[in-house]
């Protein structure tokens, strides 16, 4: 018999119940390990919260530190870090729930500020699609980005010990 748990639902239930972010004895168990392998994906594994808890407790772990994780999970913060250093980024605006945008250049991309794996992302070509995209993006969080659409191919480059790994095309 195989039991599966929706982690997002479990974390939300823990938050509402006041039980805390981690399951019973998780931090105590992790503190006994030589190193914790971070194999987590999504907002609760990549946003820096778990990494910060580990650092506060002196638990060694693999992967990115908590500040870098938090910045990387926020597309808005990432832009604020990269643009001043001359890294080209799509032009766009951050939009909070309830605020209006004066002008929308089509085509554009509408997406939640945080998250990954293209969750909540829409490519929009007109006003009707824009309205639907806003509803979709705001269903994930209260802060979204509206950016220019840049047609092209998508690539990913991992970095290990300061050295670029091979380029991988995302299809």
Residue ranges and their predicted role:
Residues 87-95:
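Phosphate/pyrophosphate-binding betaalpha-module
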Residues 125-171:
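Phosphate-binding site of ATP-dependent enzymes
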């Amino acid at each position: 018999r195989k039991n599966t748990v929706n982690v997002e639902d479990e974390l939300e239930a823990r938050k509402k119940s006041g039980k805390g972010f981690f399951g019973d004895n998780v931090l105590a168990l992790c503190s006994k390990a030589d190193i914790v392998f971070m194999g987590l994906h999504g907002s609760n594994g990549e946003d820096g919260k778990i990494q910060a808890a580990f650092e506060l407790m002196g638990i060694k772990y693999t992967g990115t530190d908590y500040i870098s994780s938090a910045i990387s999970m926020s597309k808005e913060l990432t832009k604020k870090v990269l643009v001043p250093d001359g890294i080209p980024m799509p032009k766009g605006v951050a939009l909070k729930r309830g605020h209006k945008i004066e002008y929308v250049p089509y085509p554009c991309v509408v997406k939640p500020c945080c998250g990954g794996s293209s969750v909540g992302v829409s490519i929009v070509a007109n006003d009707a699609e824009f309205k639907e995209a806003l509803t979709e993006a705001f269903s994930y969080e209260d802060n979204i980005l509206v950016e220019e659409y840049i047609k092209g191919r998508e690539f990913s480059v991992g970095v290990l010990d300061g050295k670029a790994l091979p380029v991988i095309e995302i299809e």
